[in-house]
């Protein structure tokens, strides 16, 4: 063999960067993509001033003909999308989006943490504007507050910017969002992605009622105390919105109250010279005119910016306000706004009368709206044309544009590599990943038609239909095992967390959210469920399903050779017959009474039920002998409170499993092999204190949690709870289908 013979293999020439090889037309288009900005500037010799507080919130809303014409024209174009399947259209517009590959490029080249579209947008804002005040950078202390921030991409983007830009400062941040762990927060407004939140909980402000709702006046007044350790607030961001896909033409009007609350919060918190970034959408309504005029009177520079990484076909805009100058002048007006603060702010009366808006400001505003409306209309029309037919050449050019835009972004904004040790969450990703959020499917017209259908029809047409409707050939639960006892935990970190009483369990981090939505709708809509004398015990059993009964479960447990004793948290009536042919007889201990018809969507969130359950578990743990078994009938474990009790049992037993039942409650926890931890006396004392606190909690409030979330979300517990709740919800939905068919 000739191995080389002194001949060196030539290296292939490096591929030239697309930044060097693409044509001028592509360069110009991408440069324009990242240059969509307009500013408000008072005419020479004119000063825009704040209106007198006495005229604030006094006059009815008015409409501006030119702006309404722009709105009508835009909605006419958007109406052409009403028959487009949302998932298909989304896939198409992702490809036509010139900046569509920026985030994937950043992930692979810069190691950006939580690199979402929001990350790219905020990094672009940081690279376009002098957002961080010079005064903060000179003193070496930067303080930022991030409203409506979930999942946390603005925070991770700012961290990346600071760590890679040689800006040496002590950065402190606080964030707020609707609490993804508060069980009464629905999914229409709440972002459940908690990848950053779960690692940084002490820095998140959820308010005294634990909801995280920044539109509550008491939370507005509590927030300054929460950030009181900050010398001055230098930056406030507000990225709030909620699902408007059911009425996309009125997105601006629907989100306006939230935007007003975000702006008032920023004006209250910011120090002189600070910056404010506010997400808005179209700016056609008088409410938007007033809000922008307020900001223009308070900041030296107010800019309307459409990031290149924001999809060009949507209405999203960012208001970038620099150098807060009206900290003292705005106090009287701000006091009135704070007195009227809440979800109805500016809904019935306009912030300012039309006469207080200078013509020079309104003229600039109309020009700005015309500019951004034209960009959006042109994008939608192009997407519609390409949706019908896209040539090979058009596809090739789009691919070039996307590749060039990704390289251009990285170079233009100097995005550098950041090692993982410099991330906000240095520990990396959380071990427990919840089920993904629901994606809207079908066209707008189809979704409106589906809204008119009953839950059964929508369930049958969706992905869950076969799973819910199938009959069980074997009892559920015994194959799911939570092994323990858990290692010792830090009881010193446990505390009883109070908040607003739950009116309904709308969400849970320990279940499939869409299945819970279906169950709540089914329970609320079923005529027999609404009947005063109806009880959940009336749910029929399915003759085609294989399921366990309390008798069969207890017979199996009490015949097991390793079981020395068995305690059941429930009255003798739960098990209809006396067990025969078993080694031992179970002992029954009075358990909780199960909530009646008026609380069908409270599940395990009813405070009285939780108190009874805690009392029963506390008493049972005191009666347990080494190696004994505990059986707990349960309706569900959706809440943090009940999950905390399961965690407590996880500390004390060798393993826990569950069984679904043919009756009510729909399942039972089976805790095998009592093995008390050394800290059991302290644990029992703590639970006793929680119980005493629950008895004294004031009206309208509730103990929501007593085990830290960091504990609840580690190890195998979340998977066990999710399996348990999924099985319980599936069974109840299956039974409710049978109930409907029998009527």
UniProtKB/Swiss-Prot annotation:
Record keywords, A-Z: Cytoplasm, Methyltransferase, mRNA capping, mRNA processing, Nucleus, S-adenosyl-L-methionine, Transferase
Coiled-coil residue windows: none
Binding sites annotated in the UniProt record for S-adenosyl-L-methionine: 152, 171, 239
Primary localization class, coarse: nucleus
GO function term, MF aspect, one: mRNA (nucleoside-2'-O-)-methyltransferase activity
UniProt GO cellular component terms: cytoplasm; nucleus
Recorded catalytic activity of this chain's protein: a 5'-end (N(7)-methyl 5'-triphosphoguanosine)-(2'-O-methyl-ribonucleoside)-(ribonucleotide) in mRNA + S-adenosyl-L-methionine = a 5'-end (N(7)-methyl 5'-triphosphoguanosine)-(2'-O-methyl-ribonucleoside)-(2'-O-methyl-ribonucleotide) in mRNA + S-adenosyl-L-homocysteine + H(+)
Location within or outside the cell: Nucleus; Cytoplasm
The protein's enzyme class: transferase
Domain Adrift-type SAM-dependent 2'-O-MTase: 113-326
PROSITE patterns reported in the protein's UniProt record: SAM_MT_ADRIFT
Active site annotation, chain numbering: 121, 239, 279
Record-level GO BP terms: 7-methylguanosine mRNA capping; methylation
EC number: 2.1.1.296
InterPro entries recorded: Adrift-typ_MeTrfase (IPR025807), mRNA_Cap_2O-Ribose_MeTrfase (IPR050851), RNA_MeTrfase_FtsJ_dom (IPR002877), SAM-dependent_MTases_sf (IPR029063)
The protein's role, per its UniProt record: S-adenosyl-L-methionine-dependent methyltransferase that mediates mRNA cap2 2'-O-ribose methylation to the 5'-cap structure of mRNAs. Methylates the ribose of the second nucleotide of a m(7)GpppG-capped mRNA and small nuclear RNA (snRNA) (cap0) to produce m(7)GpppRmpNm (cap2).
Protein name: Cap-specific mRNA (nucleoside-2'-O-)-methyltransferase 2
Gene that this sequence comes from: cmtr2
